[in-house]
Swiss-Prot record:
Heme b binds at residue 269. Binds 1 heme b (iron(II)-protoporphyrin IX) group per dimer. This is Catalase-peroxidase. Residues 1-20 are annotated as: Disordered. Residues 1-10 have a biased composition (Polar residues). Keywords: Heme, Hydrogen peroxide, Iron, Metal-binding, Oxidoreductase, Peroxidase. Formation of the three residue Trp-Tyr-Met cross-link is important for the catalase, but not the peroxidase activity of the enzyme. PANTHER family: CATALASE-PEROXIDASE, HYDROPEROXIDASE I, BIFUNCTIONAL CATALASE-PEROXIDASE. GO terms for biological process: cellular response to hydrogen peroxide; hydrogen peroxide catabolic process. Homodimer or homotetramer.
């Protein structure tokens, strides 16, 4: 009785119940769920990276004998393992799905997701229902990863194996680029949706949909835990036309048009099969929820052998074509060669079978006998939706056109988040530069030297443009950058072009004033026939002039580092619709927040800082410095907490922390700061400004810069962070 009655409070915390609760299980977020989350600003710290300081993945990747790597992968694809046997003796279809699902989380709205960092290895992606049994695919690839180690990242391998699989089954791919460095923790800054239940349907609480099945931004997938759409139809409703709506919306949010969508669906489903052999209730927990003895594997299946012919993944069962490991036109042959009727799989999933289902058979996965072919509701959309059907029939009649479209769409799918072609590594990179890569011509000839830069800077300073104007335009050019998919930035000077020139956040009227002045300086300099300067460089150089002017106003003589080498894109090199997704709906650095923004302004500030690759101190010093300069959207005084706007000093920090001011909310989104003694209004500000006094972590950083001995440090740190933003997209300087 004595042993059994011992309580946790009196027991050993290691050997008894106290050890069953993870340390830190009750986090601050539990007690204060509305607390501003700053973790995205410290994600993937170098402290987590086992490769150590100085490791250069690009350099290691270039050492690979890619022909040998691909040969090893091809052999691996045909080396069936008893613990997870290959369907049809070839892992190719499984690896195509692996690559597709690694890349397919990408969405255009914020550039997040995708294959660029290898995060399919981590939660939540490794345990999404739609990624069922891909844990086995990664284990099958471990001998390849083990052999090539640091020279071949998981991120690159997950895409390369898809290409090799396609090629080994007879398809000619468009190309492959390496250069995706692994990260070492989940990307927790990605918002995957509001639901708290896997595969929650749109009629449940916390839905991701508004009126009329309007999917909330930035999401692209239709349900929590799916990569794209529900193969059975919207919310499991087997309606091909409703499915077509979902497919079109979701693929558009992943940067694909109708032709690319049909090519990907038909090309991908030329290979392999879906798995739904048994009762899904017999499938165990996902990897993150499985017992430790499973060693990171999940979805243990209690139906018969649980593998091979007895596998259950999506619940849909069967191959799409009679030749599931061969590139051919059989997908369209089957789709248009039969009339179809709705049925259910052994797992209870909606799917479609030919009315004459006995006449078109495929081999069983273990080679013993044959099984019927099938189509999903999503496949039926390729026939039932008028636009998709027209494209599908055109592809069916023109095999070479289909093959080229699939090759290009697959390449786009698997490389969309890598940024410009300058980041692509390896001998298999196609020479053709594509519009979706946001091409920027590299400047030719020698770049402006220090003396020429000084001459140009003097010309800018003599124009009468203010520091705030110069800084705002340079910030607008550079701050379009997204580290998520490496798009945007100052290189290319697309702030001169549509659509960026018309974005509200960029103050088009101010651009019309400032850009022609800078253009005339560049033209006069270039007209001498010697060294040339691009407008992309001119805008950044002029922004540096603005920072130096503001620093001098505060008594600091500084030099803002500048490295020339940016190119100028043309309007023809800019896909307006594709580039328009980069328009910020919120930029707290400029104190801009559109009424239709997704989240609260302070949250959007952190989100913007994360997309710019900034830390919390860098975000803090940039906001304080930009406010001191007066570089707010439209020159608004909200948040300009200084008596000397235009001077780069630490006044913002001193005043936002001052106990002499009492803040009150007005009827709008603006807060008033009144003198505690007199009651007179001293300042107006936004929530973004006041978060540096209200949030305990940001206040701690702000206190550093508000200190009496900190102004010089604040200016130096501002310049360093400024240059970082200006050079985020300089992949010729860093990767």
């Amino acid at each position: 009785m004595m042993d059994g009655a011992q309580t946790n409070s009196g027991g050993c915390p290691v050997m008894h119940g106290g050890g069953s609760r993870p340390m830190g299980a009750t986090a601050n977020q539990h007690w204060w769920p509305n607390q501003l989350n700053l973790k995205p600003l410290s994600a993937n710290s170098e402290k987590l990276d086992p490769m150590g300081e100085g490791f250069d993945y690009a350099e290691e990747f270039q050492k690979l004998d890619m022909a040998a790597v691909k040969a090893d992968i091809a052999n691996c694809l045909k080396d069936s393992q008893d613990w997870w046997p290959a369907d049809y003796g070839h892992y190719g279809p499984l690896m195509i799905r692996l690559a597709w699902h690694s890349a397919g989380t990408y969405r255009t709205y914020d550039g997040r997701g995708g294959a660029g960092t290898g995060t399919q290895r981590f939660a939540p992606l490794n345990s999404w229902p739609d990624n069922g049994n891909l844990d086995k695919a990664r284990r099958i690839l471990w001998p390849i990863k083990e052999k090539y180690g640091k020279s071949l990242s998981w991120a690159d391998l997950l895409i390369l194996v898809g290409n090799v699989a396609l090629e080994d089954m007879g398809f000619e791919t468009f190309g492959f680029a390496g250069g995706r460095a692994d990260v070492w923790e989940p990307e927790e800054d990605i918002y995957w949706g509001p639901e708290t239940e896997w595969l929650a349907t749109s009629d449940m609480e916390n839905t991701r949909y508004g009126e009329g099945r309007d999917l909330h931004n930035p999401l692209a997938a239709v349900q929590m835990g799916l990569i794209y759409v529900n193969p059975q139809g919207p919310d499991g409703n087997p309606d091909p036309l409703a499915s077509a709506f979902d497919i079109r919306d979701t693929f558009a949010r992943m940067a694909m048009n109708d032709e690319e969508t049909v090519a990907l669906v038909a090309g991908g489903h030329t290979f392999g099969k879906a798995h739904g052999a048994g009762d899904p209730d017999l499938v165990g927990a996902e990897p993150e929820g499985a017992d430790v003895a499973e060693m990171g594997l999940g979805w243990k299946n209690g139906f018969e052998s649980g593998k091979g012919v007895h596998s259950t993944t999506s619940g849909v069962e069967g191959p799409w074509t009679p030749t599931p490991t061969q590139w051919d036109m059989s997908y369209f042959d089957v789709l248009f060669g039969h009339e179809w009727e709705l049925t259910k799989s052994p797992a209870g999933a909606h799917q479609w079978r030919p009315v004459d289902h006995e006449n078109d058979q495929a081999p069983q996965v273990d080679g013993n006998g044959t099984v019927p072919i099938m189509m999903t509701t999503a496949d039926m959309a390729m026939r039932m939706d008028p636009a998709y059907e027209k494209i599908s029939r055109d592809f069916h009649a023109n095999p070479d056109k289909f093959a080229d479209a699939f090759a290009r769409a697959w390449y786009k799918l698997t490389h969309r988040d890598m940024g410009p072609i300058q980041r692509y590594l390896g001998n298999d990179v196609p020479s053709e530069e594509l519009l979706w890569q946001d091409p920027v011509p590299m400047p030719q000839g020698p770049q402006v030297n220090d003396d020429e830069q000084a001459e140009l800077k003097a010309a800018v300073a003599a124009t009468g443009l203010t520091a705030a104007e110069l800084v705002r335009v340079a910030w607008g050019s550079a701050a379009s950058y997204r580290d998520s998919d490496k798009r945007g930035g100052a290189n290319g000077a697309r702030i001169r072009l549509q659509p960026a020139r018309g974005w509200t956040v960029n103050n088009p009227e101010e651009l019309d004033k400032v850009l022609p002045v800078l253009d005339s300086i560049a033209d006069a300099f270039n007209g001498r026939g010697g060294t040339q300067i691009t407008m992309a460089d001119m805008i950044v150089l002029a922004g540096g002039v603005g920072v130096e002017m503001a620093a001098r106003e505060a008594g600091h003589n500084i030099h803002v580092p500048f490295t020339p080498g940016r190119g100028d894109a043309t309007q023809e090199q800019t896909d307006v619709d594709s580039y328009d997704v980069l328009e910020p709906t919120s930029d707290g650095f400029r104190n801009y927040h559109a009424t239709f923004s997704l989240r609260e302004p302070a949250e959007m500030l952190v989100d913007k800082a994360a997309l710019l690759g900034l830390t919390a101190p860098e975000m803090t010093v940039l906001v304080g410095g930009l406010r001191a300069i007066g570089a707010t959207h439209g020159g608004a005084r909200h948040g300009v907490l200084t008596e000397t706007p235009g001077a780069l000093n630490n006044a913002f920090f001193k005043n936002v922390l001052s106990m002499d001011t009492v803040w009150n909310q007005t009827d709008s989104a603006i807060l008033e700061g009144k003198d505690r003694a007199s009651g007179q209004v001293k300042w107006t500000a936004t929530i973004v400004d006041l978060v540096f006094g209200s949030n305990s972590q940001l206040r701690a950083v702000a206190e550093v810069y508000a200190s009496a001995d900190a102004e010089a440090k604040m200016v130096d740190d501002f310049v360093a962070a400024w240059v970082k933003v200006m050079e985020n997209d300089r992949f010729d300087l860093h990767r």
